[in-house]
């Protein structure tokens, strides 16, 4: 009773301010009288103005009238222009601010105001409004004008007063709207028992300093999301889509508010540090600094770290575990044999897998066997330079020399063979081409057939000796570890491929085969200068045959031998000197040859 008397006295003192608010409400109704329901509210406003007794029941009717004006503006917002909506919101904020200033002068009146606003809001949300309109209504109900004195007047020491209290006011209003959205979500899913218990906790949250308000609201929100996650979809199937949208929106609101608080706290921390730096140093100040540091460290921890933050109605999809079927071999030193892999593992030191083959750089790369196991595929014939063990007993040097040596032609080994003439042929051994006889094709083919048989036989027998390469694994790794040796292999392979192409062209040309000859001792091709004496001999033998024919023609001719012998002597001189004195004499000799050829044919 005493509280009501104090409230009535305060309202009587604020009679002029209340009349000003009533005139503003009447003006709003007059400017928007085309909206349905505002005429009745305008009549109610005039009735309130005529009453001179400003009591608590009158004040509650007055707050209810203002709430009804907000409800009509939200419901009929589509009928208004953007300019009209902005003007109406501006007037409503001014009205709310004036009502709040009056209620601030009495604690009991402020409490009555908050209870009446909350009651009116619950009654209005039960009316025919869409979900978006309800959210908009909650924003309008808690959209008081910025009041820096609200938070700057807190009982704190001077350095701790908030300078930018307008930002805190905005976060305070945003938290009120978020709280109302949570209450709406709970009321829409009232069939869940757990949510009914949480609804009481939301209603009991005190609107204190914005940051503590946020902490309490966020903790309750995590419990609400846990209820949605733990309940089956059959219970929430009715409002699943709307619940998902609302949950996402509330999460976004709390996320923005959290980061805004962090920004404000960091700015305030800088201000406090600047003030502390100007004060004289003593023990009490050091304690304050340490307490501030500990408090800021605990405050900067992420608040929205609950495990259910990203879970609401998202089917709780967990990240899939790593698939075990990767093609990358395991790195332990003794890996199991992988016979199916023809591609080496990507790490720089590849493990010695018996099935891995090092491909050579040519476009159709013939694989180099990694552990003396020849590859079976027929299209690319393997480089069998060291796949077949040589007669000497020690095998380790063979396993360590799987990569061909830098010289262009490979070393002579009995396992090398000449393949059939596809475009990418393997290198040719030095013992496969016979010495200089002109028709070399028959011996080459015969020797190729002889050499191909032992290669096939060793290819069949080699898998029996498969465990042997494990002894030479370290030697093989030392040979293939360095990237420089791999580059040398590419260069030597290109050179060998070029010599192979030249040799094949010589084989196909037949008459050019005598230009490429190999020394049986060194295995290197013989230089072209070695065949020049043969060409000179051929030239001399051709001249001798011509002279012999000329002698036969002269002896068979019935003409005088003296003139002919003179000519022959001239030719002999010319043959020795290899030059003619005049052009006329050369033409004369050529004419004599052409005229005497038919007699030789006869």
UniProtKB/Swiss-Prot annotation:
InterPro entries: WH2_dom. Keywords: Actin-binding, Repeat. Homodimer. Recruits and activates the Arp2/3 complex, which in turn leads to actin polymerization, promoting Rickettsia motility during infection. Residues 537-570 are annotated as: Central and acidic domains. Residues 555-566 have a biased composition (Low complexity). This is Arp2/3 complex-activating protein rickA. Residues 318-442 have a biased composition (Pro residues). Its main location: other. Residues 578-590 have a biased composition (Basic residues). It comes from the Bacteria. Residues 307-484, 516-535, 555-602 are annotated as: Disordered. Residues 475-484 have a biased composition (Basic and acidic residues). The keyword Cell division does not apply. GO terms for cellular component: cell surface. The keyword Glycosyltransferase does not apply. It comes from Rickettsia montanensis. Residues 472-489, 499-516 form the WH2 domain. Residues 591-602 have a biased composition (Polar residues). It is found in: Cell surface. GO terms for molecular function: actin binding.
